[in-house]
A protein has these predicted regions:
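C-terminal His-loop and adjacent cap/lid subdomain of alpha/beta-hydrolase
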Residues: 1-373
Length: 373
């Protein structure tokens, strides 16, 4: 008999920490859809998203530095409402021919920037933060009829808008909670190079960003007085550094599973663990829940149908099927008995029977933006 440690999301973070600190207490571990490292990169992901929304669309959005007591809770709730209002407006004006009307009334942007569709600014914000460009209703490649421009121009912004609401919620309430624990603001983007952040994506998302001139114009805002950077307090930064953190190496048989388009704990978290265990194949086994080729459906108007409440494979936060979850459980149980994860051949045979599940040690996902060098 033995103990298998299991946790999802921040529960996965705790599971990995337990396995590293007290490996003799457990036989195997399964941190799924987990945050990883010291959570700083995860919080930076959400903070960068909020800062981008604040900069382009509503300066009253709070990124960090919440008030104490009930006032801070109210501030966070109002903040979520402001983010939702921005995303609703942009999503509702995607096909507006008067470009200036695509911008929320709260936007402080000059007329030169408002000549660029707001969806392009939202796409930029999502890309620089690392928000997935596939979502519950958007596969990123489908288009209505012969309108191929949808996938190139509109789909990224729609997917980012759908995912950003969830990611912003994480950023708002996790920041509120952690600032109180560490004693101050910890988000800091004073040295962040956002142009470098999107260097790899600006070509592939060029149409969604409305071309090179528009992209350069939007990026210029981020280093102008409109894009006032935020500095952490010494107490907040030191307090964050003192929080629980991972070293990353699997000391007990460890199995991860993550959706490739998870918008709360993006797949880069699990990739961080993968990178720490590239040669540790007897103790570490990464599984991925991958997206299908297509799942977007369209209304007769040509707009995407967003009525479905189902989460397609690989999308959503910790949205795993029964078969996927039970596969992890069975593999973790087998590993607990032997002290090693099952062989590659055995795992391949098992995973081949489960829809949407991938085992491939050569497969990789981008790290979180803050972890990319």
């Amino acid at each position: 008999k033995g103990v298998i440690a299991w946790g999802a999301s921040m529960g996965g973070f705790i599971t990995q920490a337990l396995a590293e600190r007290f490996p003799k207490l457990i036989k195997s571990a399964a941190p799924i859809c987990t945050a990883a490292g010291n959570v700083s990169s995860e919080l930076t992901y959400a903070g960068d998203l909020l800062w981008g929304l604040k900069t382009f669309f509503d300066p009253s959005i709070t990124v960090s530095g919440y008030a104490d007591g009930p006032a801070g809770v109210g501030q966070a709730a109002q903040n979520l409402g402001k983010v939702a209002a921005v995303l609703r407006h942009i999503s509702g004006t995607l096909t507006e021919t008067d470009i200036s009307k695509t911008w929320p009334a709260t936007s402080p942007m000059p007329a030169t920037i408002k000549a660029i569709p707001a969806r392009s600014a939202l796409t930029l914000v999502g890309l620089m933060a690392g928000v997935p460009t596939q979502s519950q209703h958007i596969d990123g490649s489908s288009f209505p009829g012969t309108e191929t421009g949808f996938a190139l121009a509109l789909a990224p912004a729609i997917a980012i808008a759908q995912n950003a609401g969830y990611a912003a919620g994480l950023g708002i309430f996790a920041t509120l909670d952690l600032e109180r624990r560490v004693g101050g603001a910890f988000y800091d983007n004073t040295a962040t190079d956002y142009a470098k952040r999107i260097a790899d994506e600006r070509a592939s998302f060029n149409v969604a960003l409305s071309g090179n001139d528009a992209t350069n114009g939007l990026l210029s805002i981020l280093s102008s007085p409109y894009g006032k950077r935020i500095a952490a307090s010494d107490q907040g930064l030191n307090g964050l550094k003192a929080q629980l953190a991972h070293k990353g190496k699997a000391l007990v048989p460890t199995i991860t599973m993550t959706g490739t388009a998870d918008m709360i704990t993006p797949a880069g978290n699990s990739q961080w663990l993968v990178n720490k265990n590239l040669k540790n194949t007897k103790k570490f086994l990464p599984l991925w829940v991958v997206t299908a080729d297509k799942w977007t459906k369209f209304l007769p108007t040509g707009s995407p149908d967003t009525s479905s409440t189902a989460w397609p494979s690989g999308t959503g936060h910790c949205q795993f099927s029964y078969d996927q979850t039970m596969t992890v459980a069975k593999l973790a149980a087998a590993a607990a008995k032997t002290g090693s994860v099952p062989s590659n051949a055995s795992v391949e045979k098992t995973v081949a029977k489960v829809d949407g599940l991938l085992f491939d040690r050569e497969f990789s996902m981008p790290l979180l933006k803050a972890d990319q060098k």
